[in-house]
Amino acid sequence: MSDSPEKTNSECSHEIAAMMGVHALYWKIEEQADQINLDPPLSKQERHLLVSLATPKRMGVLAREMASLPSSVTVIVDSLEAKDFIRRTRDPDDRRAYQLELTESGQIGRKALVEKAGKLFRQISGLNSIEIETFAQLASKAREKALESGIPEGMKK
């Protein structure tokens, strides 16, 4: 068997080739993810939460969308709130509850993170706009199915 990725992918099923591709893509992005940061610097979890908060959301909803435990989200929220990226406001639909929303700094930071992450993804993946759209649809479908049975242990950290 050859060490060539092309040769390896042609010798296995589409399912295995897909898993190998996603695995390599994940680790290459993980390796370079710290290039995507702001001032003040944010942790990986803080960046993930900031990007996930496109619109105001309750913490439970955000935890579910991020496939994280609510207690983990609370710690991240406290940190981002201290850095003036997010704020807690009363939920207009339920005055007993709070929701999270981006501050002006948070909106600017989120926009910068999304742009930098998109550029990094295009560079690493080599996919064009149409391929990215198709990949995003397929990956979202696979993610939804994968999370039906609960949050994988590795995502809880």
Residues covered by each model-derived region:
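Alpha-helical linker/hinge and terminal dimerization helices associated
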Residues: 25-36, 66, 109-131, 142-153
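N-terminal helix-turn-helix DNA-binding core of bacterial DNA-binding proteins
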Residues: 31-72
